[in-house]
Amino acid sequence: MSLSVEAKAKIVADFGRDANDTGSSEVQVALLTAQINHLQGHFSEHKKDHHSRRGLLRMVSTRRKLLDYLKRKDVASYVSLIERLGLRR
């Protein structure tokens, strides 16, 4: 199951420049991170769900590309976002 409307709105409010900012890289990365974290719980129960795992890998790849773009364009917001999301880098 995907994220609820309320959860997405909270993420957009926390990471966006305003309440309707859904397109910025920071918001997109935060939404992808929430979806990835949600799917990790799914895979602890359903180890053989390879179809969903392919979707997870696609999300991880998209997040990596967005983070690389953000690192090229604005290093300060990249570092801030990584710390706020608790990602490794």
From Swiss-Prot:
InterPro entries (UniProt xref): Ribosomal_uS15, Ribosomal_uS15_bac-type, uS15_NS1_RNA-bd_sf
Keyword vocabulary terms for this entry: Ribonucleoprotein, Ribosomal protein, RNA-binding, rRNA-binding
Intrachain disulfide bonds: none
A biological-process GO annotation: translation
NCBIfam families cross-referenced by the UniProt entry: S15_bact (TIGR00952)
Subunit structure, interactors included: Part of the 30S ribosomal subunit. Forms a bridge to the 50S subunit in the 70S ribosome, contacting the 23S rRNA.
Protein name: Small ribosomal subunit protein uS15
Lineage: Bacteria, Pseudomonadati, Pseudomonadota, Gammaproteobacteria, Enterobacterales
